[in-house]
């Protein structure tokens, strides 16, 4: 699957009209979910050296044009963004102080 994802992302990177295709959008969403859960990373160590997964970085950038802007209301606060906010900080074991924000796709 990873090989297919890389090919789909690299093709969409070179030809942005492919962002209109359902398969491309589904691939991007699957990659973002994997990054969100910490199973896939933009950069990782390999044999003691850091390696950048360019295709993951490209998928994150390509995520923005396929998302719609939406208003997100949290208590008295209002945001207007293309990415959902993360939730369930307690279950994630993460301390979040007032007005800290993490978006969906960020592994904590």
Where are these regions (language model features)?
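Terminal amphipathic alpha-helical/low-complexity segments used for targeting or macromolecular assembly
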Residues: 1-95
């Amino acid at each position: 699957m990873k090989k297919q994802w890389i090919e789909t992302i690299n093709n969409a990177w070179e030809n942005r009209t492919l962002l209109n295709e359902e398969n491309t959008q589904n691939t991007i969403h699957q990659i973002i979910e994997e990054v969100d859960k910490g199973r896939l990373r933009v950069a990782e160590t390999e044999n003691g050296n850091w390696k950048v997964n360019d295709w993951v970085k490209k998928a994150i950038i390509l995520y923005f044009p396929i998302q719609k802007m939406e208003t997100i209301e949290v208590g008295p606060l209002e945001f207007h963004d293309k990415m959902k906010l993360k939730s369930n900080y307690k279950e994630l074991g993460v301390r979040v102080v007032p007005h800290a924000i993490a978006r969906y796709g960020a592994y904590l």
